[in-house]
A protein has these predicted regions:
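Acidic, low-complexity intrinsically disordered segments
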Residues: 1-204
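Radical SAM [4Fe-4S] cluster-binding motif and immediate context
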Residues: 145-294, 298-307
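A structural preference for short, hydrophobic beta-strand core positions in alpha/beta folds
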Residues: 41-43, 87, 240, 288, ...
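Radical SAM enzyme core and accessory elements
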Residues: 2-5, 35-41, 53-57, 77-80, ...
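Alpha-helical structural signal in soluble globular domains
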Residues: 32, 36, 77, 81, ...
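Structural recognition of alpha->loop->beta junctions
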Residues: 98-117, 254-263, 304-319
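Flexible glycine/acidic-rich beta-alpha junction loops that bind and position SAM and/or redox cofactors
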Residues: 8, 12-13, 94-98, 175, ...
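Hydrophobic residues within beta-strands of alpha/beta enzymes
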Residues: 58, 106, 180, 210-212, ...
Length: 405
């Protein structure tokens, strides 16, 4: 039996450096497919999709809302050819009803320990329209090593440099941030993987640069420290989302190879200034993630925010426009206030204004988004800042400072 696993193309942010990371969702899903089944993986962002080759079953993995329209197009084409099509992934969980119009079956939730029965249903011509495991999570111990051998790593380099591999040490998130749908998708409970499973997976990856994609590592101080102790002997360098603002945690993170952190910058406070400084004190670089268009943002505030980012010496910054994704508090509030402009999901890529801001016009917010990118990278382009981060990896002493070796 042969499965064709497709990761549809989506519109990238205009200002981002053109590099591509190996997708995580498809390789995690592939690990739940029985070993005796052949998998052909196509990342449409990196190679053309041949819609005429033969397979037994088509699986379409969608992470982003802006990816969904193309995924639906692909599903329609294969179904018109008589192929059975199953959809899964984050975007499917956010848009199940729409996806069902383009699918023979949709899988909602996490696939570990569950997908073998879907395969049996397919073989017996009893495929169900919906497999709904939302908030019904498999045992965390059942999450094994992702199946990365389906990837063509030649697609995931930038100027000859191999990009980071993605991996997770936990699922779920105890926080409930207003623009985020993680609580709906993965639950509000922190679900850490066993340390031996995490170490086994990290050790299996033929890459010394990793991205630990957990929504936040700062959910359990004791767990963080034990995780960093466990992975330190692997001597890999990694980036992640926030780490606990604690000297002991930061010390062990640095020793374990923390390279840089994606840190939300939500205001111009001394708290943020000190948060960035403390990362850097431990040799950890910082990429700020900044959402523009909040209800208290006006033109003057956004311009002062960009000035502040330059003052605190961020290594990188990624600007996005507040986007009302389904199943977020932002969506609920804006839907109730009738501030959502349209539901053209291709535009929901966090680089286009799809709602009515409170303190400015849609056009002005789009202009300020462009201003933020252009101003922050005026003196040193993004590609050079990124090159500087990669150069750090060649010098261990620039990553781990004298006091925390």
């Amino acid at each position: 039996m042969k499965i064709k696993l497709i990761y549809p193309k989506w519109p990238k942010l205009e200002f981002q450096t053109e590099f591509h990371l190996p997708p995580h969702g498809p390789v995690v899903f592939a690990a739940s497919i029985p070993e005796n089944i052949d998998i052909e993986f196509v990342d449409e962002n990196r190679e053309p999709l041949d819609l005429n080759d033969d397979c037994d079953l088509v699986c379409i993995s969608m992470m982003l809302t802006s990816q969904a329209p193309r995924g639906w197009e692909i599903g329609d084409i294969y179904r018109s050819k008589g192929k059975k099509v199953i959809f899964g992934g984050i975007a499917v969980m956010l848009h199940p009803e729409e996806t069902m119009k383009h699918a023979d079956s949709v899988f909602l939730g996490e696939t570990e320990t569950r997908f073998e029965s879907v395969i049996e249903d397919f073989k017996n011509n009893k495929l169900k329209p919906v497999y709904n495991y939302m908030q019904d999570f498999p045992p965390i111990e059942s999450i094994g090593t992702a199946k990365r051998n389906i990837l063509n790593y030649n697609h995931y380099t930038y100027k000859g440099v191999k990009m980071v591999d993605l991996v997770h040490a936990s699922r779920g998130c105890k926080f409930n941030c207003f623009p985020c749908c993680t609580g709906y998708l993965g639950g509000r409970k922190f679900r850490p993987r066993p340390f031996d499973k995490v170490v086994e997976e990290l050790a299996s990856i033929n890459n010394d640069k990793l991205f630990i994609v957990d929504n936040s590592l700062a959910q359990d101080k004791k767990w963080e420290i034990e995780l960093f102790k466990a992975i330190a002997p692997l001597k890999k360098k990694w980036c992640c989302h926030p780490i606990e603002d604690d000297d002991e945690v930061l010390k062990y993170a640095s020793k374990a190879g923390a390279w840089y952190v994606y840190q939300a910058i939500f205001d111009t406070s001394d708290y943020i200034r000190n948060r960035v400084k403390r990362y850097k004190d431990y040799g950890i670089a910082v990429e700020g993630t900044i959402i523009l268009g909040l209800d208290d943002h006006d033109e003057d505030y956004i311009k002062r925010l960009v000035d502040f980012l330059l003052e605190i010496d961020l290594d990188l910054a990624e600007f996005t426009i507040l986007t009302p994704y389904p199943h977020t508090k932002t969506w609920a509030d804006m839907h109730k206030e009738k501030r959502i402009l349209h539901y053209n999901w291709r535009d929901y890529n966090a680089g286009k204004v799809v709602f009515k801001p409170k303190l400015m016009s849609e056009k002005k917010l789009q202009e300020l988004y462009n201003y933020a990118w252009n101003t922050f990278y005026k003196d040193e382009p993004q590609r050079l800042k990124m090159a500087r981060l990669f150069k750090q990896l060649k010098n261990k002493n620039s990553i781990i400072k004298e006091g925390v070796k």
